[in-house]
Structures are given as structure tokens and as C-alpha cells.
């Protein structure tokens, strides 16, 4: 998750805030991420899902126009994966940024506005998803 091991959850997220001229409020974001109660913990004291949420928080706090998520559920169990997808969905709805998600999990496409499938570096499919499914309703 590329967290700085000797910094707390809050400090890891604040690193992102320092890199932005328009950062989000760290306290509000900690609440959105479900990490407010864990803000003083170090990364090695967190579960994999909490570490992933901290990494997402560090990216989101910069208030980017585009958020790139590369395999956001790759190393997580089913329930934690769904929690992370719900978090990404919530952040997208709350802050209005564009989310580009790269994944090998084909089921995740059902929550997207637009789907672009690649194979061997070539676009194989490119379509708008007419019937989006909320993250918590995805099954795989």
C-alpha cells in the first residue's frame, strides 16, 4: 500500500494534503474512510483493508480531478474488497472526481459508468454501462 511505516494513519494522509493547493479536510476524510478511530495507529497496527483505506485517503485528500486505482482489491478478501469498492464509490459521489480503475476482477465493471476492456495492449471493448450496480451488490 506504500504507506510510510513510521507515520500514523493521520500523518500518512496529511502527506498527501501537503502536496495539494486545494486539499480536503483531513478530519472529514478520516470519518468518510472509517479511520477516525484509528488515526493514531501505525500501518503495522492496521488490517489490510484499513491500510488500503489509508492509501486511498492519501490519494483523495489531494482532491484530484482524476483518481487512478490500480487493482484496489487485489490483495484483499471478498468482504474487505466490497468495503473498498463501496468506499471508492462513496468518495466518487461525495467529491465528484473521475475514478479510473484498473482490475482483473471482471465483476467490478458492473459498477462503472464506462468500461474499457484491454487485451494485449489493445482496446477490445469500449462501452457505457446503462445499468450500474452498487458496489455492495456486486458478486464474484
Residue ranges and their predicted role:
Residues 63:
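Conserved catalytic motifs of ABC-family nucleotide-binding domains
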Residues 42-52:
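Conserved ABC ATPase signature
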Residues 14, 21-37:
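Conserved ABC ATPase "signature" region
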